[in-house]
Amino acid sequence: MAAPTLLTYGTGNVDETLTLAMTNMIPGIKDNIFNENTALGWFYSTGKEEKKGGASLSHGVQYAKSTSGGSYSRYGQMITTPQDNKTRDQWPWKQYYWNVSIDGFTERIAGGGDNAIEDALQEKRDEAEMTMKDRLEIDIFKSSPATDDLRSLPNLVLGSGTEGQINGTNNSWWQSNVLTAGSWATGVGRTQLTNACNTASKRNPTGPVECLMSDQTSVEAYESTLVAQYRYTTNKADIGLTKLLFKEIPWLWSVQANSGVIYGLHSKAIKFYVHSGTDFKFTGFYPANAAGQDAKVGQILLAAALTTPIRRKLFKTTANAA
């Protein structure tokens, strides 16, 4: 890395005012780059579950009803045929890292003593953690995850394909409900989302999904159908809504979400597992002596898995538009 860029002093750049008075260096680094990671936040607050170990993760899955029973009278024959209606899925852990490095000059010399404005080491860690969260949000909505990436919503919430080592193309009980929507202005978007919500409500676990997750455009398409009614009922000249619900289900949106897609999620049907000992764990700094550098390096580590034990409870509507 190049030498630090210093301010240019001298008579052409610094006058009497700057010679006699210091610039007021306001503490804090103002974020002009990172986005709100809505989906990751929901998974951490609602769908997260910590686990300690295991080479992989697995749920017991019920895939059929028992038919070994019925009515009878007196000496009537009872069905005693044994049945096997259960199996298991399997989900491998996915590991993430982000490097945190600092050179000796910044840590000991420039950033030491009374002239330090910020804690350089902590700022480096905070930046790496926020970057890692941005990466996870992207991966949650990635259409084609890499082998080492988390499984993503576009693949988990699908009416086909193998997830958790169970074939959803051949097994209808391992398929999410996927509907093609359309314009909200003409009512197609609302009709399809209503149908998807009602269908999910009758599937175990009983009740509606807990969250709708979409892109900004889909949220605004729905919101535009509500504004006129909102103004009429409140007598306020307001053209927006601060909290969005659909059939009393909270509706969130992410900057990384798939265009025109609305997901229906339930915390018992989609699980975000995090290894309790590797949940944004910082390894600590160690010398970068191998490269002959006056520097320290460390990593922030995460081991996690985005899974679905009840794929049929999840849904999505696609092609949503204003």
Per-segment meaning from a language model:
Residues 2-322:
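Flexible, glycine/threonine- and acidic-rich loop/arm segments that mediate assembly and lattice contacts
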